[in-house]
């Protein structure tokens, strides 16, 4: 997949995931939020909790999941820490990391709290 096609496919996947969160009462507060450590695809809120969402698109959900590396997770953690620094409770803000997997047919599988140890 060329860079431009891949970029647009990623945007389409992110939009589909954002709609799911919005419709389930967890409004998306930011898209492609960028900090010094990296970028977070989507940031949603569920009450006082902040949800950091990494969207992965590939031919299958399994292939999409395989594209998430430890290094990428570390960058997301760093960017999330930067985002939380701007919250009233700072690092004490309730938060979680979800991964949204999108397959070639546009089907979405959301893994809540995916980065839990």
From Swiss-Prot:
SUPFAM superfamilies: Restriction endonuclease-like. One of its GO terms (molecular function) is nucleic acid binding. InterPro entries: Restrct_endonuc-II-like, tRNA_endonuc-like_dom_sf, UPF0102_YraN-like. Pfam families: UPF0102. Belongs to the UPF0102 family. This is UPF0102 protein RSKD131_0118. It comes from Cereibacter sphaeroides (strain KD131 / KCTC 12085).
């Amino acid at each position: 997949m060329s860079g431009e096609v891949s970029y647009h496919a990623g945007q389409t996947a992110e939009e589909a995931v954002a709609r799911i969160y919005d419709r389930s009462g967890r409004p998306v507060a930011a898209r492609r939020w960028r900090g010094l450590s990296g970028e977070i695809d989507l940031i949603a809120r569920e009450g006082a909790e902040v949800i950091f969402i990494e969207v992965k698109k590939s031919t299958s959900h399994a292939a999409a999941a395989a594209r998430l590396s430890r290094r990428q997770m570390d960058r997301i953690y760093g960017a999330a820490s930067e985002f939380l620094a701007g919250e009233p409770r700072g690092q004490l803000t309730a938060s979680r990391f979800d991964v949204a997997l999108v397959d070639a047919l546009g089907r979405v599988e959301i893994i809540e709290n995916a980065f839990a140890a």
